Amino acid sequence: MTRRYFGTDGIRGTVGEAPITADFVLKLGWAMGRVLSRRTGRKSRAKVLIGKDTRISGYMFESALEAGLSAAGVDVSLLGPMPTPGIAYLTRTFRADAGIVISASHNPFQDNGIKFFSAEGVKLADAVEEEIEAELDLPLSTVAPDALGKALRIQDAAGRYIEFCKSTVPDRLTLEGLKVVLDCAHGATYHIAPSVLRELGAEVSLIGAEPDGLNINHGVGSTHPAALRAAVIERGADLGVALDGDGDRVVLVDAEGREVDGDDILYLIARDRRARDLLGGGVVGTLMSNFGLAAALEALDIPFERAKVGDRYVMERLAANGWQLGGESSGHIVCGHVQTTGDGIVSALQVLAIMVREGASLAALLQGFEKAPQALVNVRLTPETDKEALLGNEQVQHTVASVEAELGEEGRVLLRPSGTEPLIRVMVEGRPHFDVDALARRIADDIEGHMVR
């Protein structure tokens, strides 16, 4: 079935432009409610949790979803600002039938999106998303007045998730003596992550923790680590932690200001859990994962598999293999022994716990782990440009082939249309003697030259 609305991570776009409009989101809530009621098959009303990040449009879409779900006879519990992984966790612990996230993750405030979790706290199966899309074709109708859904606001949601995050490290472990700069991207973790780290004993200073509805991800967060690098050096911190707007990604910075990405974090957690005989299988990365990660895991005799880009595909491969650990270079890390989805706070805590156990700095822990030089260029497309047609352009394919020939067996090229933004991502990876930045730029320039304007 061809999808009209759902991408790799729910439905996302620019606020006020179809489909990210109040009327569509109201009907989306209604369609979700209809599907849930049918699937649960209970006489009692289905129950859904709704959480959001800090975008100003979140108020509008929260109300729209609440109205649509109520019209379908579904009860709603409102969490307010809450990280995406917190919504997944609370959906499970409240025994809700589904969780809904209002967020566009690392995108700017002008964008927003809707994504769903099942009762188990994992992304919805494709079949369920297709059912929701089918319901959207039907005229909206309201259940009988005595069957309408109710809504309530959960007052202690943040505190519950804070305690969960702390529970993912050993009870007696303390972060006392660690000086941490925390960047919350002016997003959904601003009132949660500082409390988690401080209650575990860390000395925490903040950037990106003053959301105003318009500044989410603006020059801060995991996709803009320069601000964190500068703050770590200026404040003499042991490390920095950068989360994204909805808290499902994390990037770290060591005491010297060097960025520690998702591949580094996966390596550290995998090595630590293997050493303690806790790994439970292998590691799932993605097509974007650095060759150095695969080589380092192989040297440790840890199986490694690549999934398509997107945390839902990482989760699918983890489930298929019966493994627990996976993630993306961007900082989506799934620690399946404690969480059902990517969780930036929890992933950071796993690394902090390793630092405490080993009595070592972040830089020391990564000593000897070498990644292949990798360049990533994002080409933003014009509205008139078709992604697939552009990737199939004969001249673009010729340029890609020439770069691949130049790299030979010592590198690779990956072109990937974003599932959440109007972008084509150009990745070139190669041995140190290649100028991967120049090679990636060559391909990106050719793509830009063939866009429809």
Curated annotation (Swiss-Prot):
Activated by phosphorylation. GO terms for cellular component: cytosol. Catalyzes the conversion of glucosamine-6-phosphate to glucosamine-1-phosphate. Its EC number is 5.4.2.10. Belongs to the phosphohexose mutase family. The lineage of its organism: Bacteria, Pseudomonadati, Pseudomonadota, Gammaproteobacteria, Oceanospirillales. Binds 1 Mg(2+) ion per subunit. Its cofactor is Mg(2+). It comes from Chromohalobacter salexigens (strain ATCC BAA-138 / DSM 3043 / CIP 106854 / NCIMB 13768 / 1H11). It catalyses: alpha-D-glucosamine 1-phosphate = D-glucosamine 6-phosphate. This is Phosphoglucosamine mutase. The modification Phosphoserine is found at S105. One of its GO terms (biological process) is UDP-N-acetylglucosamine biosynthetic process. The gene is glmM. One of its GO terms (molecular function) is magnesium ion binding. Keywords: Isomerase, Magnesium, Metal-binding, Phosphoprotein. Mg(2+) binds at S105, D244, D246, D248. The active site is at S105 (phosphoserine intermediate).
